[in-house]
């Protein structure tokens, strides 16, 4: 057996060992903790058993921070989190202190580095079906609408939160995910001394059964939560597709 095949077999065995049935009733949505945002989502948060896409700005740092902040809200009792990074020299190991700064304990992460996009999508599908994982993150992957539908079905089967951190691109494919967000870094608070809190401009571009909106957020690194950073432009639009 080749090293590659052995790695795939080992991962399958690890996911199988984790897989146990959760209590009947499913998991509640994952609230962002920001009432203005959660009020714009039909379920009051990100629905588990579904795919949610995050489209970063020119650089992925803001997207990574936003995703880590969301994952940090998952109870530890929900299980571990698989983080699958797309092949490529830029996708090195996640910076543990940076992740911990957003309330996500590095020890909860199972980091996977497939050799091809095909393998990465397979990993995501298997992980989303594993009912003992709290969430699965596809970092740098750009699935086609058909591939995204497969991931959605896998997430529904596992009742698992699926987050796709798309690569920076001017023309992402049409979304079939439950939500699609655009996250970009925002300027620091001019009143802050030195290095201010992380700030992001977050746009909800698509929400199945809901609307859209724009928010300026900042990360409170003492309370470990997201807060509104200033005046909010939140304009509901027609019901989403």
Residue ranges and their predicted role:
Residues 167-223, 227-231, 238:
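Phosphate-binding/switch region of NTP-binding enzymes
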Residues 51-53, 111, 180:
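Conserved beta-strand scaffold positions in the cores of enzyme catalytic domains, especially
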Residues 78-134, 141, 145-149, 154-158:
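Conserved nucleotide-cofactor-binding alpha/beta core module
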Residues 1-83, 92, 98-106, 206-210, ...:
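Detector for small/aliphatic-rich hydrophobic stretches
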Residues 46-47, 128-130, 156, 194-196:
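Solvent-exposed alpha-helices and their adjacent loops that cap or buttress functional pockets
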């Amino acid at each position: 057996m080749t090293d590659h095949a052995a790695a795939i077999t080992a991962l399958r065995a690890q996911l199988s060992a984790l897989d146990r049935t959760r209590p009947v009733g499913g998991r509640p949505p994952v609230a962002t903790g920001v009432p203005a945002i959660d009020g714009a989502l039909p379920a009051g948060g990100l629905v588990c058993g579904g795919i949610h896409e995050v489209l970063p700005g020119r650089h992925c740092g803001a997207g990574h921070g936003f995703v880590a902040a969301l994952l940090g809200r998952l109870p530890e009792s929900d299980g571990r989190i698989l983080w699958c990074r797309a092949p490529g020299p830029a996708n090195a190991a996640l910076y543990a202190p940076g992740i911990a700064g957003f309330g996500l304990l590095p020890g909860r992460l199972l980091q996977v580095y497939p050799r091809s996009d095909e393998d990465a999508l397979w990993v995501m599908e298997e992980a989303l079906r594993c009912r003992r994982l709290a969430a699965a993150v596809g970092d740098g992957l750009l699935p086609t609408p058909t591939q995204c539908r497969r991931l959605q079905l896998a997430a529904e089967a596992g009742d698992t939160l699926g987050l796709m951190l798309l690569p920076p691109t001017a023309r992402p494919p049409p979304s079939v995910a439950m939500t699609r967000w655009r996250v970009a870094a925002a300027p620091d608070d001019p009143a802050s001394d030195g290095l201010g809190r992380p700030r992001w401009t977050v746009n909800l571009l698509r929400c199945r059964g809901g609307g859209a909106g724009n928010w300026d957020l900042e990360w409170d690194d003492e309370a470990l939560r997201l807060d509104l950073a200033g005046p909010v432009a939140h304009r509901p639009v027609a019901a989403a597709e």
